[in-house]
UniProtKB/Swiss-Prot annotation:
CDD domains, A to Z: Ribosomal_L16_L10e
Native species: Nitratidesulfovibrio vulgaris (strain ATCC 29579 / DSM 644 / CCUG 34227 / NCIMB 8303 / VKM B-1760 / Hildenborough) (Desulfovibrio vulgaris)
GO molecular function: rRNA binding; structural constituent of ribosome; tRNA binding
Name of the protein this chain belongs to: Large ribosomal subunit protein uL16
NCBIfam families cross-referenced by the UniProt entry: rplP_bact
Length: 137
């Protein structure tokens, strides 16, 4: 699972995920990518599950880039606990995603194989996505 090595604070406020992505909105490394078209939070487990689904489909060929990183801590209180008495303990990491953000990229395999691999990855994610191809490919 992906997680940061060191963070300034153990617990963050949730905040709001407004607007559209301006950074990371184009396919930069690969030939074809998976782009989010709605707001959401992707946990490190979801990011890893999608990566494994892609890698199993493309087997040994090609290269995959993960363009997002889970750097926000997620907290949770124990089950059957009353409200109050502070914020819960950190249980994992998530990456906030805005519409337009490219999540994954693939290069080195045929476009048909890459599209099928990205479709399988999209089924593992909680946000709506669309497959985008870099111009000139």
């Amino acid at each position: 699972m992906l997680s940061p090595r060191k963070v300034k604070f153990r617990k963050w406020q949730k905040g709001r995920n407004k607007g559209v992505a301006t950074r990371g909105a184009t396919v930069a490394f690969g030939d074809i990518g998976l782009k989010a078209i709605e707001h959401g939070k992707l946990t490190s487990q979801q990011i890893e599950a999608a990566r494994i689904a892609m890698m199993r489909h493309i087997k040994r060929g090609g290269k995959v880039w993960i363009r997002i990183f889970p750097d926000r801590p997620v907290t949770a209180k124990p089950l059957e606990t009353r409200q109050g008495s502070g914020k819960g303990s950190p249980v994992g990491w998530c990456a906030p995603v805005k519409p337009g953000r490219v999540l994954y990229e693939i290069k080195g395999v045929s476009l048909e194989l890459a599209k099928e691999a990205l479709t399988r990855a999209a089924h593992k994610l909680p946000v709506k996505t669309v497959i985008v191809v870099r111009e000139g490919v």
